[in-house]
Amino acid sequence: MAASQRPSWSESKVAGVVQEGNREAPQDIKMALYKHGQLIPSLGDAKFRSPIISEIIEKKFEHYRNDKTLNIHGTLVFGTSSSLSGIMANLVFRNSFKVKYEALKTYASLTTLPVLATIVSYKLFVTDALQSGDISKESCVLRSALIGMACGVSYPSALAFYKNGRLAVKYQTVPLPPKGRVMLHWLLLCQTGMKAMAIPLFFQIVMGAFTGLHHYNICEKPRARLVPDD
């Protein structure tokens, strides 16, 4: 009889702790389970949420890697289009000046320099501004279009005009200009080629605007995820 009245070891061990089964927990334990009106998660809930949090973080990093890859690929495509524009400019001005010498040298410079100019300019004026968040959508599209026009058409055209003009004078493939009309003479020689460059000009402006808009939307995705819905 005395043995039945004596509390068991397990009951005495969990005194002050939430009791098992249908037995109700003490009042102080109930109050301790609540903090600022919210139930404190148990150890089981924490273990359950831990893989979920890890999965969410992993998905965030995966989205970041995908967005960064798309950004790099878009910039490289934009630079490649400037390179193609430089090749076309070199071809047009070589035909205008009737130059058939040093083709590899001129094509190498007209292929690589516009790419580098486009990528560096886009990095300085668009990508850095997007990462800092100090640029609007309209400004981003405008800057990208101007970079396409300047680095994708104007710079390759001026470079091709200069290099092939020097070769034309060096090898005397065209008549030398009279005194006082040097610039007019060269412009008349290559006016057909300058008109042909209107095609890559339009293409580079559209390409730049599309690239800027695309990268703006990519950079706005993470910010939109951080803003809670009303």
UniProtKB/Swiss-Prot annotation:
It holds the Pfam family TMEM126. GO terms for biological process: mitochondrial respiratory chain complex I assembly; mitochondrion organization; response to food. It is found in: Mitochondrion membrane. Its main location: mitochondrion. The chain crosses the membrane at residues 70-92, 107-126, 139-161, 196-218. Keywords: Chaperone, Membrane, Mitochondrion, Transmembrane, Transmembrane helix. InterPro entries: TMEM126. It is a multi-pass membrane protein. GO terms for cellular component: mitochondrial membrane. Belongs to the TMEM126 family. Part of the mitochondrial complex I assembly/MCIA complex that comprises at least the core subunits TMEM126B, NDUFAF1, ECSIT and ACAD9 and complement subunits such as COA1 and TMEM186. Associates with the intermediate 370 kDa subcomplex of incompletely assembled complex I. Interacts with TMEM70. As part of the MCIA complex, involved in the assembly of the mitochondrial complex I. Participates in constructing the membrane arm of complex I. This is Complex I assembly factor TMEM126B, mitochondrial. It comes from Mus musculus. The gene is Tmem126b.
